[in-house]
Amino acid sequence: MSTVSERKATQVFFAPRAADWDTRFAGDDEKYAAVARELNPPVGGIVLDAGCGTARASAAFVDALGPTGCVVNFDVTVEMLTAASRAGRPGSFGVADATELPLRDASVDVILAAGLLPHLGDPLAGLRELARVTKPGGRLAVFHPISRVALAARHAQVPSDDDAIAPARLLPMLTASGWEPASVDDGVDRFCVIASRVPPEKMSGIVTA
């Protein structure tokens, strides 16, 4: 579970930026649509956008899921959800912490975690919670529409192997939390790691602690 201070810090950062977020980063729309297509959710399935912000992938997910599917968009910042609603983004919306999701075990087919992990005080706990709600074989994308270098520069930092999305740290965390990394795109235009949910009965052979 994120602490109150961690949630507050996230809200303080995003709330004043919510109203013009999509305008400032309008060039990212196709990248969100592309990662939604890569995740390839099943027709009629359930997609979770954890830390959805303004839910920029929701329309692409709805197109893939068809009329019987469902996109669930959760964020801790009300202002971002309000901006998503004003933009007419589809799906259901709710305020929820990605480390304490109001969802049943093994209820979700696909998860998008876009820009999420760097804002969690305990990213490993977040990945474990995402694994809890995902069906065996379900897929997760840890995604940023810009490179790690550009993301660090946006926050006046330089990339480090200690960063939550640095492959040297992220890949072991994924394995330890019930995911099997399938692909890594640590490129100049985006960051995207896609992983599959390991069936719980197989975890004993992967995780030793």
Regions found by a protein language model. Name each.
Residues 142-144:
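Acidic carboxylate diad motif detector
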